[in-house]
């Protein structure tokens, strides 16, 4: 079974058609796979879609449909939600010190990266991320990362 972790930048492509959406949609059709997100992505996804409403990219109705589709993916276990723990927060602080002094590692990304690293110790095959700066940081941490906007994921 292939296990994927979707950063929010990749996850949003499941619910809003844009560059990289076809690659993300293809993951969801794989038979023997598991897709994991952090509980933080629930908030980040809502924020990203709300921004699309404010900027006129989608309607409020489309926002509600996308959130409903996301909830359906979670309820049907199409997506597994992992909870950030205290150890992840401690690890995120260390990652900010390691990377934040030289690169633009943001707070929420450091939390996502801490979870990715924890999961990679036992069950993670690949990270999907559509933020090239963050992809570079993830890669420096030794994880396999693909950008759905640039890479074929199959």
Functional labels for PLM-detected ranges:
Residues 1-41, 52-65, 151-154:
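Short, well-structured N-terminal submotif of metal-dependent ribonuclease cores
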Residues 1-3, 118-154:
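Acidic, PIN/NYN-like endoribonuclease modules and their adjacent C-terminal/linker elements
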Residues 11, 41-42, 88, 112, ...:
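Alpha-helix capping/helix-boundary segments
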Residues 22, 47, 90, 135-136:
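Alpha-helical elements of the RecA-like P-loop NTPase motor core of helicases
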Residues 47-54, 117-121:
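Short glycine/serine- and small hydrophobic-enriched flexible loop segments
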Residues 51-86:
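Helix-adjacent hinge/juxtasegments
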Residues 79-130:
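Active-site neighborhoods of divalent-metal-dependent phosphate/nucleic-acid chemistry enzymes
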């Amino acid at each position: 079974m292939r296990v994927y972790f979707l950063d929010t930048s990749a996850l949003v492509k499941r619910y809003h058609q844009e560059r990289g959406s076809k690659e993300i949609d293809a993951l969801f059709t794989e038979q023997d796979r598991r897709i994991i997100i952090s509980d933080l992505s629930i908030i980040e996804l809502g924020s990203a879609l709300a921004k699309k409403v404010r900027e006129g990219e989608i309607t409020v109705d489309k926002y509600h449909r996308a959130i409903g589709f996301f909830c359906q993916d979670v309820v049907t276990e199409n997506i597994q939600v992992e909870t950030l723990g205290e150890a992840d927060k401690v690890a995120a602080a260390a990652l900010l010190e390691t990377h934040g002094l030289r690169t633009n590692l943001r707070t929420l990304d450091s939390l996502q990266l801490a979870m990715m690293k924890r999961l990679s110790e036992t069950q993670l095959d690949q990270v999907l991320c559509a933020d090239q700066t963050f992809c570079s940081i993830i890669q420096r941490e030794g994880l396999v990362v693909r950008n759905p906007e640039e890479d074929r994921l199959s």
